Curated annotation (Swiss-Prot):
It is a multi-pass membrane protein. This is Na(+)/H(+) antiporter NhaB. One of its GO terms (molecular function) is sodium:proton antiporter activity. It comes from Pseudomonas putida (strain ATCC 47054 / DSM 6125 / CFBP 8728 / NCIMB 11950 / KT2440). Belongs to the NhaB Na(+)/H(+) (TC 2.A.34) antiporter family.
Amino acid sequence: MSRPLTGALAHGFLGKSPIWYKVVICLFLVLNPLLLVTIGPVATGWALVLEFIFTLAMALKCYPLMPGGLLLIEALLLQMTTPQALYEELQHNFPVILLLMFMVAGIHFMKELLLFLFSRILLGVRSKAILALLFCVLSAFLSAFLDALTVTAVIISAAVGFYAVYHRVASGANPREDSALESDQQVAHLHREDLDQFRAFLRSLLMHGAVGTALGGVCTLVGEPQNLLIGHEMGWHFVDFFLKVAPVSLPVLGAGLVTCVLLEKVRLFGYGTLMPEPVRRVLTAYAAEDDAARTQAQRIALWVQGLAALILIICLGLHVAEVGLIGLMVIVLITAFTGITDEHRLGRAFQDAMPFTSLLVVFFAVVAVIHQQQLFSPLINWVLALPAEQQPGMLYLANGLLSAISDNVFVATIYITEVKQAFLDGSMSREHFETLAVAINTGTNLPSVATPNGQAAFLFLLTSAIAPLIRLSYGRMVWMALPYTVVMGGLGWWAVTYWL
């Protein structure tokens, strides 16, 4: 093979990922067959799980679907699991795939309504503590019924829009014309301090909103993908799920909202910055122009989206159908009554969800390997050997630590499957099984706010267009999430241990 061709192949492998990352993935692929031959399938299975967790932790270097997919293709070739076992896992978890395919796309068509709500709140409330609380509450409420990724996307859209308007004004450009938002070279010296303060203001609001999605997402069956997965295993419907997790989720929700207000009052961990008055004047004038230019068709679209949201909440509460099918109904209702009939416009609604849906299939392949090699059986047996009152707390901690560095859907899938198998084997009562299921659900949802790796909404925020504009880095996100991690994670553990 010629050198130019070899170089092109090496350059194309995993795209723009760092060279060291490409080398590590290649080493994994070479090492696994050697491990299988020398030390057996169980140790190789553990190596595969750790390698996959590595790809999740390094999600900012390369989306985990590609390296994780390569590892799992190799696992299938090495017969560490079978295509039939993977297919059975997918069949078993089909409701979760439906959720990601149709519910996320359905909420995409409500973006105008959600953007309208967040914009009104941002400009209508002057108290920063109340504003932060409203962002957190609204994000929590919406995430309890909708999709956390979509709610985060809407908040990001509002933030990008407002940032762009002021950045253009500060640069002497027309606020309605495109300009380079990444560069501050054209920003007048007079406006630089206000722009930096506005960045800090947006950072704090976005973090409050992202945490809100976790606070609300843990409460209901559809709040997070892993909730539906756990609810499906337990046979819980929407109301059942809410009532089962309420002893943990509701106290944590209250504590999280109190933390939100306190952080704004004490101005620690990067919170408490106010919106500069010159920025408020510019944005208010811009919003007034937008309102005046809104057409009758746009107003009708907002009403249609609002009615569809009400129907969605009612259908979820009554469990009239699988969650994903309700999402498909929302797509049909909104598009039919707002005139969205173009195939390409419909297709854009599915773009956000399909990469993660594909990654979920890889998750289930890892779970199939874990099942076939019985990797987690010793750990589950150790937990179940503890006194019954200690088991929920230990499962919560085990889930929380792993979810902080890995993906919480992956972690929840592993633990709920293993615990259910122990229940089916007669190792526990149904009541205790339900307690452990709540511990797994809250353990994957609450402590995972510690890093962007654990919560999909956090990772989405970190990799979005707004993050570099407002100087929101990985380290800064971890620092700003720290007080929430301590409060939510700590109280969640206490509630699981003593209140269930």
